[in-house]
Regions:
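Short amphipathic alpha-helices and their capping/turn segments at secondary-structure boundaries
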Residues: 1, 27-43
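Glycine-rich, proline-tolerant flexible connector loops at the mouths of alpha/beta enzymes
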Residues: 40-72
Length: 109
């Protein structure tokens, strides 16, 4: 499914964000629930803490360093995209650093 084909319709996007807890099965559960609820797309976020914050901030702030736990592992991408296809929903993901665009390209429409 390509969302662009639905130009005149309301689209429902389930925002998982970083609530996956780096757990693939939890991510699958979000996708399955979103599909069952009738969502058109499931959206994640792809970021790397060292790309978001300066080394000085990360060195001084444990709170910021702990956000590394929120990162979506790149190895999840093909499996998340496949699970979305299986559920007939679109996989989408916000890239937060330039290289993320290339990393996501094979998996998004």
């Amino acid at each position: 499914m390509r969302l662009a084909k639905n130009e005149n319709k309301i689209l429902f996007i389930a925002e998982v964000s970083s609530n996956h807890h780096r757990d693939l099965n939890r991510s699958f559960a979000f996708i399955d629930a979103a599909a069952q609820a009738g969502c058109h797309s499931v959206k994640f976020q792809l970021f790397k803490i060292e790309q978001l914050f300066s080394p000085e901030i990360l060195e001084r702030s444990e709170k910021h360093r702990k956000r590394e736990e929120w990162e979506l592992p790149n190895e999840f991408l093909p499996e998340l995209a496949a699970r979305c296809r299986k559920n007939n929903v679109e996989f989408s993901c916000t890239p937060f650093y330039l290289d993320a665009v290339e990393e996501l390209e094979p998996y998004v429409d």
